[in-house]
Amino acid sequence: MSKSRLTVFSFVRRFLLRLMVVLAVFWGGGIALFSVAPVPFSAVMAERQVSAWLHGNFRYVAHSDWVSMDQISPWMGLAVIAAEDQKFPEHWGFDVASIEQALAHNERNENRIRGASTISQQTAKNLFLWDGRSWVRKGLEAGLTLGIETVWSKKRILTVYLNIAEFGDGVFGVEAAAQRYFHKPASKLTRSEAALLAAVLPNPLRFKVSAPSGYVRGRQAWILRQMYQLGGESFMQQHQLD
């Protein structure tokens, strides 16, 4: 290998190492800070805002209204757990059984990809990472998930998740969603309303809370049944999530 190539390789290696250190400090600081402080914005919110500006939409504003867990109806937390991650109180960020099932399903159905991200993984991704699918992003997501699972309580993870989740175009967080769709604060959401909000989470830009399709209504009904089977509000109390 020539001297010039060695110089370039050495420069790239040093740059990547420094970048990794900077990102580790940035993300580590974010995990520590947001373990106690309200989250003002997320990576997904920033991505949506920049995308809107690039497309000439300067009226678009991505924001969320932070609320603590005692300002959120217990039905809402239960609804997203029932819909997205029923083993949330038990695992350390990853549901291995669901991952194995998703991999097996995706091998058989390449055109219908199934995910297996837990609430913890979704929180890490939405808060710190860009949208999309790649092994690099998945690797970073895994590290960030371990970080928040180590530093944050389950209640804190759920609180942050509910405050940064996307419920529609420009609608981030359960407080903004409750006000937009039901004209009430998140603390007043009913069991049915919470299930409807949770029903659009797989794809909130495609599925509409304001005009729910038959699929969304069916998913809402399924979530309501799962909420009942989990034990209702007592589930949240039992796992100290309320």
UniProtKB/Swiss-Prot annotation:
One GO location term (cellular component): peptidoglycan-based cell wall
> Which organism encodes this protein?
Escherichia coli O17:K52:H18 (strain UMN026 / ExPEC)
Record field: transmembrane: 19-39
Q: In which pathway does it act?
A: Cell wall biogenesis; peptidoglycan biosynthesis
Q: Where in the cell is it found?
A: Cell inner membrane
Query: This protein is called what?
Result: Biosynthetic peptidoglycan transglycosylase
A single Gene Ontology MF term assigned here is: pentosyltransferase activity
Top-level taxon in the UniProt lineage? Bacteria
The entry sums up its family as follows:
Belongs to the glycosyltransferase 51 family.
* Record's keyword annotation contains Aminoacyl-tRNA synthetase: no
Q: Which GO terms describe its biological process?
A: cell wall organization; peptidoglycan biosynthetic process; regulation of cell shape
> What does the record give as EC number?
2.4.99.28
The way it spans or sits in the membrane comes to: Single-pass membrane protein
Which purpose does this protein serve, as stated in its record? Peptidoglycan polymerase that catalyzes glycan chain elongation from lipid-linked precursors.
Family matches, as InterPro entries: Glyco_trans_51, Lysozyme-like_dom_sf, PBP_transglycosylase, Pep_trsgly
Could you list this entry's UniProt keywords, alphabetically sorted: Cell inner membrane, Cell membrane, Cell shape, Cell wall biogenesis/degradation, Glycosyltransferase, Membrane, Peptidoglycan synthesis, Transferase, Transmembrane, Transmembrane helix
Per its record, the protein catalyses: [GlcNAc-(1->4)-Mur2Ac(oyl-L-Ala-gamma-D-Glu-L-Lys-D-Ala-D-Ala)](n)-di-trans,octa-cis-undecaprenyl diphosphate + beta-D-GlcNAc-(1->4)-Mur2Ac(oyl-L-Ala-gamma-D-Glu-L-Lys-D-Ala-D-Ala)-di-trans,octa-cis-undecaprenyl diphosphate = [GlcNAc-(1->4)-Mur2Ac(oyl-L-Ala-gamma-D-Glu-L-Lys-D-Ala-D-Ala)](n+1)-di-trans,octa-cis-undecaprenyl diphosphate + di-trans,octa-cis-undecaprenyl diphosphate + H(+)
